[in-house]
């Protein structure tokens, strides 16, 4: 029986990697070895940045809340502490949305936090 060298399997494997590398710059979408390296890096970046995205959004929300809180005469930490004392459970995402889109509602929350801090 003749030896099977696996040409079909190898071609399929290479084709799959090159298909994943479609749109990459330069040799990274043409040459198998560089494409394979770039695809591996891309998977790593995607995995890493799915986690980084959560941290980035939390930072953005805190920055927005802090800016709005300072417009109401409080720091971010004072506002959050005051809201906790007032037993108002609003997450940072919603607070940031209120700060940007509904200043009156945010001011009401800030006033409630101030009232609890004063006691």
From Swiss-Prot:
A biological process from GO: translation
Cellular component aspect of the GO annotation: ribonucleoprotein complex; ribosome
Keyword Ribosomal protein tagged: yes
Keyword terms: Ribonucleoprotein, Ribosomal protein, RNA-binding, rRNA-binding
InterPro entries cross-referenced by the UniProt entry: Ribosomal_bL20, RIBOSOMAL_L20_CS, Ribosomal_protein_bL20_C
Taxonomic superkingdom: Bacteria
GO molecular function: rRNA binding; structural constituent of ribosome
Cited PROSITE patterns: RIBOSOMAL_L20
Family: Belongs to the bacterial ribosomal protein bL20 family.
Function comment: Binds directly to 23S ribosomal RNA and is necessary for the in vitro assembly process of the 50S ribosomal subunit. It is not involved in the protein synthesizing functions of that subunit.
HAMAP family: Ribosomal_bL20
Protein name: Large ribosomal subunit protein bL20
Underlying gene: rplT
